Each structure stands twice: as C-alpha cells, then as structure tokens.
C-alpha cells in the first residue's frame, strides 16, 4: 500500500473478500470469519497517517432519525456531536455505528484530520465539501 501511495496511486482497500483458512494438522481448512471493513479501514488510515478517511456506503449522508418521518441528513459533525449521537443510539449497530466508530478512532489518533462518509457516486463531491457527511 505504501509503495502504491509513493507512486501517487489512489489505493482502495479493506473491502473484505478472500477466503479465510486455518491450519489444522497438515491441512488448510476453510474458517468462518468476518472482516469488519470499517474498523480495518480506520486502522489502515491511522497506520499510514492519512489526513482523510473516506468510508463509502450506500447512503449519501449520515442521518439522525434514519428511516423516520423526521429524518435529518447531516453534512457536518464534530467529534463531540458524533459521540453524543452515538450514545443516543442514533446510528444502527450493524450499519452506521461501525462507520462512526471507525471515523472517531481515526480522528482521535491525530490532528488536522477529517473523516467523510458518503456514496461512491458522491465521493468526488464529498472531498470538495459538496456532499456526504464530514466529521472533524
């Protein structure tokens, strides 16, 4: 990954895939495993000392009251606001919460960082502050 970055390449990684195996005796056997993509993405971003962590998902923005009549999309959140909303249970435990947790862990590990959550289609707009949810 560092080699690709040093060659000015955009690296898209930590998307899961692969077949987990474990050694049993002299054989490799399939193993049940889940790769938490959001967590791994955040860890990689910390390891390479990235300035921005972008998490791509199927919604353009993080929302409060998601799926309800009073749903409120957020274009920006502070770390403190994200923590507060997480404590209030605003984020689905198997959908948005892991993304928020990964973003918060990344942001707290360095200075002058931001995390962006959006869709692949809006990624370029999000980098330019015109789409998605930015957490700083």
Regions found by a protein language model. Name each.
Residues 1-136:
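C-terminal catalytic "cap/lid" subdomain
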């Amino acid at each position: 990954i560092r080699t690709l970055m040093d060659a000015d390449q955009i690296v898209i990684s930590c998307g899961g895939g692969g077949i987990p195996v474990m050694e049993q005796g002299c054989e490799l056997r399939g193993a049940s495993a889940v790769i938490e993509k959001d967590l791994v993405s955040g860890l990689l971003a910390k390891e390479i000392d990235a300035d921005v962590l972008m998490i791509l998902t199927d919604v353009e923005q993080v929302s409060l009251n998601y799926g309800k009549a009073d749903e409120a999309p957020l274009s920006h959140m502070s770390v403190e606001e994200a923590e507060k909303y997480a404590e209030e249970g605003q984020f689905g435990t198997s959908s948005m919460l892991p993304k928020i947790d990964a973003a918060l862990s990344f942001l707290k590990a360095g200075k002058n960082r931001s995390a962006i959550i959006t869709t692949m289609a809006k990624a370029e707009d999000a980098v330019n502050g015109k789409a998605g949810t930015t957490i700083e």
